[in-house]
């Protein structure tokens, strides 16, 4: 596993794309970001549309090595699910763990989503390990 303080490389061409995604985020991304930004989540610093390697993660906390992905309808096909699985495996090789939520979960049950993230962070704090 990589040191949590290590720098995670990203392809420089992704910087502009990530900025564009931040400027044109979905409603689900907006409402989750309102709960994560400014270290509101237990003092952890989350970033949105974070370039890592050759990909962009919806939300990322370096200290927790936690990626949060919001899956919209484009992720429902078997081909998309396989692509997401392979992508997640690549990130897990860097020691990054994932939480995935659907857009519907974010829109319809945001409190539960926040609780899942808090529980994940609590477990990390208590054990020093990622789930």
Give names to the regions the model predicted.
Residues 1-43, 123-131:
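Solvent-exposed, charged helical/coil patches
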